[in-house]
Amino acid sequence: MAFDFDVIQRFYQRLAERVSAAREAVGRPLTYAEKVLYAHLWSSDRPRPFKRGDAYVNFGPDRVAMQDATAQMALLQFMQAGKSRVAVPATVHADHLIPAKNGAGLDLAAALDMNREVYAFLASASSAYGIGFWKPGAGIIHPVSYTHLTLPTKRIV
């Protein structure tokens, strides 16, 4: 993946601004976890001290990554919402419907045959709503997400 360094710089500048505002609102230094969480408050929430076990806090992700077995229902629900595009970058990874039985080549061929309709739906729906699609055999969701799609302190769901 080619990273857009302007986007990265803006993200980290915004991160620093949000952490600074949170530290001022809380009135003390923040732990690393608090910095990451305060930096991802939903846009309508303002930084303030949150009492553990008492407060309800809305967070926004930087990215959504879905695997093929659950993305089907998620995309159907998204389609029902009437939105034309996703609000944050999102990807579908076709990896969970590939059985590990006879070796990579045979397993991929079997999955392509068995799940052809599912993969066609995922690719089509992803394309229609601006969602990236990692086709079967393109990689396993976890290492792909961490090596190609995110950066330190970014929140991925």
What does each model-identified segment do?
Residues 68-70, 100-104, 142-146:
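Short, solvent-exposed polar/charged micro-motifs at secondary-structure junctions
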Residues 125, 140-142:
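Acidic, glycine-enriched active-site microenvironments
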Residues 147-153:
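Conserved small/polar residues in nucleotide/adenosyl-binding loops
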Residues 129-137:
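Short secondary-structure capping/junction motifs at helix and strand boundaries
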Residues 5-8, 106-112, 141:
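Conserved short loop/turn motifs at secondary-structure junctions
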Residues 2-88:
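N-terminal amphipathic, basic-rich helices that act as targeting or association modules
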Residues 76-130:
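Glycine-rich, flexible beta-strand/loop modules in the N-terminal catalytic cores of phosphate-handling
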